[in-house]
Amino acid sequence: MIRPRAECLRIRCRWILPIGRPALESGWIGISGGIVTSLGQGIPPGPFIDLEDAIIVPGFVNAHTHLEFSNLQSPLDTSGGLLAWIPRVVAMRRQRDPHTVCDAITKGIEESLAAGVTAIGDIVTTEYPTKKSTDPQIVCLQEVLGLSPLSASRIQTMRTRLASLRSAGYRVGISPHAPYSLSWTNSHSLCTEASKHSMVMAMHLGEGPLEEEFTKTSSGPWKDLLQHY
């Protein structure tokens, strides 16, 4: 048993699930300065808070989400599959204003905290709300699409947005959308950009046989759809 440091907040409960080691029945956890510093079983040394039959687990991680959709009352219509769903997403995004999106993101952050989520990888397409000290850890991944070569102005716009998010206190990264919505040249350029600045990346991959057909042959239903954009 590791003894907690002085001035440590100790919490006892029925079960503690450290994830990296076996569960602790009748366990306790010590926290100093917002950091877990000790774990043990039985009665903790010194004062403690007893949560009785509760279970303590590490905060949940939502590694890939789109908080901008948090204000939807119900999911978008999925009839017709992914090829029909994508145009609905595009149409909805074009109808919204930045203030509505920021409100949706704020709502999503609040709901995440209420559900025990402490780290989020959010795909970002527009303005972002001001960071609060109570927010979970958020990695803002700037989404990029484009089959035609990315212009210097688009690259600069992306860099400006990332710099703004970084200065606001967010960790940032890049999200090349998907193989069917971004050319190989653009994907390579974005990977180089992310590597140069030590940024994380996220990408939609393996979303069905039609994606595989398009990436291998540059033909099929995906090609027909993309010709409209």
Where are the regions a protein language model picked out?
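Metal-coordinating catalytic core of metallo-dependent amide/deamination hydrolases
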Residues: 126-229
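Active-site gating loops and adjacent loop-to-helix segments of metal-dependent hydrolytic enzymes
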Residues: 71-103, 139-142, 208-229
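General structural feature for long, well-ordered alpha-helical segments within catalytic domains
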Residues: 35, 97, 104, 108-109, ...
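N-terminal metal-binding scaffold of metallo-dependent hydrolase/deaminase domains
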Residues: 1-45, 55
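A broadly conserved amphipathic alpha-helix scaffold signal in soluble, globular proteins
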Residues: 102-114, 118, 163, 188-195
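Catalytic pocket of metal/acid-base enzymes, prominently hydrolases
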Residues: 67-88, 111-120, 124-143, 201-203, ...
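Divalent metal-coordination and catalytic microenvironments
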Residues: 14, 29, 34, 53, ...
